[in-house]
Amino acid sequence: MAAGVEAAAEVAATEIKMEEESGAPGVPSGNGAPGPKGEGERPAQNEKRKEKNIKRGGNRFEPYANPTKRYRAFITNIPFDVKWQSLKDLVKEKVGEVTYVELLMDAEGKSRGCAVVEFKMEESMKKAAEVLNKHSLSGRPLKVKEDPDGEHARRAMQKVMATTGGMGMGPGGPGMITIPPSILNNPNIPNEIIHALQAGRLGSTVFVANLDYKVGWKKLKEVFSMAGVVVRADILEDKDGKSRGIGTVTFEQSIEAVQAISMFNGQLLFDRPMHVKMDERALPKGDFFPPERPQQLPHGLGGIGMGLGPGGQPIDANHLNKGIGMGNIGPAGMGMEGIGFGINKMGGMEGPFGGGMENMGRFGSGMNMGRINEILSNALKRGEIIAKQGGGGGGGSVPGIERMGPGIDRLGGAGMERMGAGLGHGMDRVGSEIERMGLVMDRMGSVERMGSGIERMGPLGLDHMASSIERMGQTMERIGSGVERMGAGMGFGLERMAAPIDRVGQTIERMGSGVERMGPAIERMGLSMERMVPAGMGAGLERMGPVMDRMATGLERMGANNLERMGLERMGANSLERMGLERMGANSLERMGPAMGPALGAGIERMGLAMGGGGGASFDRAIEMERGNFGGSFAGSFGGAGGHAPGVARKACQIFVRNLPFDFTWKMLKDKFNECGHVLYADIKMENGKSKGCGVVKFESPEVAERACRMMNGMKLSGREIDVRIDRNA
């Protein structure tokens, strides 16, 4: 269509030129009379000239007299060492002016021995076919055919694509370009552009229209640089130097130009939608690709909708009857032999259905046998119904059903046995893993070393517990309400833990020997407890009375059933008897006075089993017990006024941040971590007045600090990935 417009513009230009030669309008004649045309028609002529310039696309050169036609000749049997320039010189010498020469190249840039030559005039094309046909070039006779519609070149190009997949534009021309699916399936990109891009024959310049008049080439380059490397950007201007609202952008690669069309066509720039397309000079002059021909429809049919196949293509109904091994299921007969043939293929089997079922054991670990049973049952029911209905091929399914009998027997025999063996092998592995857990738990027998630590509790800190217990009274009152809330939650959680804890029961039995070794150590602890009863404990224990009442109700919610499921009864009464608890209950507890009350008794009864099982859980590292930190830990925690023991790790509220940007200040650090919770303190580590790239942040609770580690660790600040950890040295 654009070519037709240009042709019309040329005709209009010719008419204007003829009018100018005949006489300028409005110029008075020799007798002073006005000419045949008045001065009022001059603006109309100027408008025509402007329209002519716009339609011609800025006076671009068009080498063809009639742009709608191409006068091509297709030459084959060209020596492989002949370059396109040499071929052009030969054709120019023998025929005349040549517009375009293209050698077809393979993927390696070597000549395929054929070429396309375009001429400006039709006579030149016919002369080339007469003169150059059978002309000897380097000992090889050339074969020249007229090819105005490009059919011969199209076939040759298809043959090249089928063999090598490459095509060049000339000497050293590029091969076929691999196009990503995002471009191939993009509805905004025409098919002819995609074909030209694949062949490497597409330019890298795009044409942009409907630009705002204040957009200059710098702004245009800035915008289109998002699509690729911009080599040049131009804004077309009028004779006064003002923008015409159109421009061109040249990229480094053709695929970047196609990407620019996809990214910016229809997008707003200063509230005006841009119209982006390939520039006419970037498109190949000859179309050597098969056009996208629409599907031929019957006469009178306007169109069709989407089919049921992939991409809306119609599907062949014949393929629907070819199910995977399900035979031909229809009113005439079920075709059970088809089921057998299909299932045989599932395992690479051969033979009828019965022989194939032997190998069903291969699928023991991966197939849902219940689902297979359901499918077979439904198939048998359908077969019985069809057999009862009779008629047609109904009887043809009976032999297939009979053949299924021994096959199903084999499925229940050898196949299921193999499944059992496979499951048994898996359970054996689980058993071996549990045995390994037992060995680990056996190593906990080193609890005997706890005895020496407990023995140190007496002289180190137990005598000083009186003043500490007084201070504990108020704290325990605050803990009471929390324990009540914990009761309901722990009870619900322990119910879920019942099944896994049952499995650990056998392992806990192995802990019995380790607990038995604790007996003599706890006997020594009984003697130390007798020293704990100075009069100063009375006031503190009186305050603990109501607190223990609350703890009792919380422990009641935990439920005895949940504790029984924990497998603690397997530890044995003998082990607990040897712990020397009778010495702790006789004299020591009586001297602790009525302040403990019956609530403490009930609480201790319910806490006994739980504390017995969990007492050693805090000492995960055997190396701490070897160093005697057990006794020192309790001495520090009971004897000191709220001090933390060196052997027991406490949760810190401070985090340490590494790899911070060097321009980061403490205020910026605080503002950033305020997203995680309330920050009490933030600081940047400095050296000689310069940041060391690390800092600390302190929160109001350990939970907030841990949340900050989870949220901020690995986050990028100014391009640097920070490392956030709990500050253990705080």
From Swiss-Prot:
Any one GO CC term of the record: membrane
Cross-link (Glycyl lysine isopeptide (Lys-Gly) (interchain with G-Cter in SUMO2)): 17, 37, 69, 83, 88, 127, 134, 143, 145, 221, 277, 285, 345, 381, 388, 651, 667, 685, 692, 698, 716
Sequence repeats: from-to residues: 400-405, 407-412, 415-420, 426-431, 433-438, 440-445, 446-451, 453-458, 461-466, 468-473, 475-480, 482-487, 493-498, 500-505, 507-512, 514-519, 521-526, 528-533, 540-545, 547-552, 554-559, 562-566, 567-572, 575-579, 580-585, 588-593, 603-608
Residues the record lists as N-acetylalanine modifications: A2
One family name in Pfam for this protein: RRM_1
Modified how: Sumoylated.
Coiled-coil annotated spans: none
GO biological process, one term: alternative mRNA splicing, via spliceosome
Biased composition (Low complexity): 1-13
Key words, A-Z: Acetylation, Isopeptide bond, Methylation, mRNA processing, mRNA splicing, Nucleus, Phosphoprotein, Repeat, Ribonucleoprotein, RNA-binding, Spliceosome, Ubl conjugation
Phosphoserine, modified sites: 29, 86, 204, 365, 377, 397, 432, 452, 468, 481, 528, 575, 588, 618, 633, 637, 701
Record GO terms (molecular function): mRNA binding; protein domain specific binding; RNA binding
Residue ranges of the region described as Disordered: 1-62
Gene3D superfamilies membership: 3.30.70.330
Region 27 X 6 AA repeats of [GEVSTPAN]-[ILMV]-[DE]-[RH]-[MLVI]-[GAV]: start-end pairs: 400-608
Residue ranges constituting the RRM domain according to the UniProt record: 71-149, 204-281, 653-729
Main location: nucleus
Modified residues (N6-acetyllysine): K134, K277, K672, K698
Cross-link (Glycyl lysine isopeptide (Lys-Gly) (interchain with G-Cter in SUMO1)): K698
Function: Pre-mRNA binding protein in vivo, binds avidly to poly(G) and poly(U) RNA homopolymers in vitro. Involved in splicing. Acts as a receptor for carcinoembryonic antigen in Kupffer cells, may initiate a series of signaling events leading to tyrosine phosphorylation of proteins and induction of IL-1 alpha, IL-6, IL-10 and tumor necrosis factor alpha cytokines.
PANTHER family in the cross-refs: RNA RECOGNITION MOTIF RRM DOMAIN CONTAINING PROTEIN
Subunit architecture: Identified in the spliceosome C complex. Interacts with PPIA/CYPA.
Record's protein name: Heterogeneous nuclear ribonucleoprotein M
Taxonomy of the source species: Eukaryota, Metazoa, Chordata, Craniata, Vertebrata
Gene, per the UniProt record: HNRNPM
